[in-house]
Amino acid sequence: MIMDCDRIDLAEEFSTKDFLLSEDIMYEGDKVKILQKVKSQRQQVEEAMTKLKDEESVQNFTQYDIERQLMDNITEKQFSKYKKLLNKLETITHLIFSLSVRINEKKIFNSKHQGLVMLKYQMNNAKEVLMEIEKNLEQFLLFLSSNINPKFCDTFTNFINRKKHNICLRRALVRELYFIHLKFDIVNLLWTKKNPEKILLK
């Protein structure tokens, strides 16, 4: 399920209690310590992004092999159905990830605004669409099992699961990098406000 995608937890590298920025934080040692934590977090996320890019490259080759076998064993109409299912799966995965983020943000701020109700309604609709797509994929797998072989079906299933996972992971990493850069900007802003003659570099 898309909702079970891995979450990035960098709590050991960067504790929010050590990042209580205020105008009272004046000492250079404290600033350096904060920046070191943020840089460590950025490095970890960038390494994860590099690893993900490598896996995506391998996944592209896997997809090429899968689709080549499909074209050799099924009709053009059936192959077109597969491509449409794959495109729908990617689209709904992006949508569910985005809705999850927005709902979590509303909950964090204890929002009881009507917007939260609408987001939950949209999420329920998205889940129903996802269930229908997954049902169609299961039927497609049964068809493949009888027309190709079970081993190929295992490869196909693993490919689909990794594709969903990597879509969510990429979105999470990009989002995390955005907030890391934001932390750098906040530190620099507070520091230069009190020490205009000094500039912290990222």
Identify the role of each PLM range.
Residues 1-202:
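Long intrinsically disordered, low-complexity, acidic S/T/P-rich regions
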